[in-house]
Amino acid sequence: MSGDAAIEIVRVFVVSGTEEVAMAAPTARPLSAVASASPVPRVGRSAMARSRTTTATRSRATDSATPAVTTPASDAEWAASSPLEFGPSVADVASCDALAVVGKKACVLDERMLAHVPEVVRAHVRALAEAMTPGDGGAKRTTSVLISNSDASESLLELTVVILPDASALSRHNAPSGSHAAAKWLAQLKTPKSGKTLGVACALPDASEAVAIAAAIARAFPTYSAKSTACRHTERGRGAVAVNGTVRVALFDASASAAGDAGAVTGDALASAAAVADGVRLAARIVDTPPASMDPDALVAEALNACAELNARSGVSPVTATTLREAELIAGGFGGIVGVGAAAARDGREPALVHLCHRGARGAAARSVALVGKGITFDTGGLQIKGKGGMPGMKTDLGGAAATLGAFRAAVTLDPDGARRGGGDLHCVLCIAENAVGASAFRPDDVLLCKSGRSVEINNTDAEGRLVLADGVAFASGETIDADDVVDVATLTGAQMVATGRHFAGIVSDSEAFETACVRAGRISGDLTHPLPYAPEFFSKEFGSAVADMRNSVKDRSNAQTSCAGQFVANHLAPDFSGASGGRDGAAAKRWLHVDIAGPATEKGSGRGTGFGVALLVELLRATGRREDE
């Protein structure tokens, strides 16, 4: 879909028991397109005009024969189907149908928090907490408590106590909040059914841990589900999404000196926790959605819906959106994105580049930041196709784009005029394509001309993510955006998991200060990162080509593959990012940061999205605004 084509959105019905609730469909926004006069991106090949059937057209043509799957059409509707609330008091969550108390042992046993819990429950919380030794992974125990109700009846309360590891039990590279343990244990709890509530009382040693724990809670209660309901046999129940009950979260600061409600986390800390949790759930849902539903058109629509949501809020500086589809990408010289998305485009799933921009109060006088996300909606490996064991799960290859979009929405929500980040502009660039197999697929030995002007010989069609990112960072660092800081986020290499594992993203940067700030942001947010070598003199040579400026895959797969992949992306930055000093108006040198989230973007075992990267980027933007990264 391109130009002024509108997004078709169907009205949604969500089934809860035998009740059907109609959810209003959001207003469709047209896709804007901007083209520039540049050479055709693929070397030695002219662009071919293709007629195609859009997703909307296909659905209209088949509606009469195939029942529509009545899934929510917007993030707000998905969130409404499985509500997560931050802000209730401890007393409020203690009155829910089930209760989980979470925190380090000393905080859980804090009498100021326990004073808000019914006395009979309080005794069980103490007993369970005292009996547990959390070690370095935390611990959980569950019991049932007989509660006397105000009408003289009795009921059973399912009580769970989760004790997080003390900071002293965790290594220096881990997050002192122990948020990894919170996510692990809370994920074992059942999401409440419609009409029921689950209360989560979080006892924190400090309000600064609120975001990390909130992100962990968001991971434990994701929104996407295609599981059928009890009404699946009815016409409207077939394919419907069940409405879950509400998870209500109270955050209590055990370090507060005053007693009672004075310990409740409020203000900026609470707002940050809620906004980041929303961003994490958005990113996780995008990753979890099947590729037939989350195709390039759908991912573009997610970005435009986020833009519309932000613009609908009062006090938010305008957010602009520019969308380039295949014809505009060809005209603009985005050869990497066009090449990767060529086969899917023939079937109507055109590649795209989406640019969201939130102008800060100081504009060009302050540092601007561009978040660039890899959005491969499905990766078959291309003509060098993945095997039967390697292709399942490749719907998650858009995790970088999902994380940057979730972080952008959270950052703008928390910083309506950009003051928190120093008043500079914030950009989000999504590089979207499906790496499909077909007659139009790019081939080994093809040469692509990327946005940077560099030519790339293809020696691995399954190393496609770096090609779309190359165009993204060239766009972000070039004259159109001219960002001071460029951060690219991607599920880029399986080698990342070999280098830094499933809990740590691997990062590469040309700035030691930026690298250090990212590591610190990871420990604060719970989205852990670890530096990998930045050495262009060693790694650029891996991409040598006899016929082009470079190849897209390394010669030596044992030579720091993840660093090499990052270096490939860096080679497409504007020239003033190559270690030059000065920057705009005497500011620090322009900087680049590469974040490979291949491992932590999904949960091992379930394969579900984690929303990793949202909390990290929001904290990194906060640190950048306060100049804590210099």
Residue ranges and their predicted role:
Residues 60-368, 372-375:
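Short amphipathic alpha-helical segment within the helicase RecA-like ATPase core
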Residues 300-630:
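A generic structural signal for tightly packed, nonpolar segments enriched in small/aliphatic residues
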